[in-house]
Amino acid sequence: NNPNNPTGKIYSEEEIKGLAEILRENNSKTGRITYLICDEPYRAIVYDGAKVAPAFQFYENTVIVSSFAKDLSLPGERIGYVSVNPKSDNPDEFIKAVTFALRVLGCVNAPAFFQKVIAKSWDAKVDYSSYKTRRDKLMAVLDKAGIQYHRPEGAFYLFCKVPENFNGDDGDFCFHLKKHLILA
């Protein structure tokens, strides 16, 4: 996914191009199409001028999965979409397969009312600045505590390294935090 959950890393254009080349080589070698499925619900939540590379431009057999709930900052509203690159080898077949899978797996569609809300909100401008403010505050607290982390370039996650004195055991670290009512 891009930006990545849980690290907030944004994969660069070069990384996406490299992955596309590997997939093309695999397609040639196997005679089968491998799809690049990009889970991008956080693509609009980016920091410090970062941008999410447009995978459609680099690999024809790309599918984008995203979420209006994240795009429009509507937490809890489970409404999203799948977009198939029109340049892919067989976009209609892929769409049929996804539609079939949704029916067979019993996925529930978003209520009609909310589908209309999304249609009317398509061009809404969302202020994501609160995510950056929270990220920066949390990084300052972690810096002060001496806890290492991957600096998130996007999304609203911050992935920390378990402190040395816990020997890399995240379970022990979480239990320690819970004892001090830091983590529920």
Question: Each predicted region: which residue ranges?
Answer:
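PLP-dependent class I/II
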Residues: 1-184
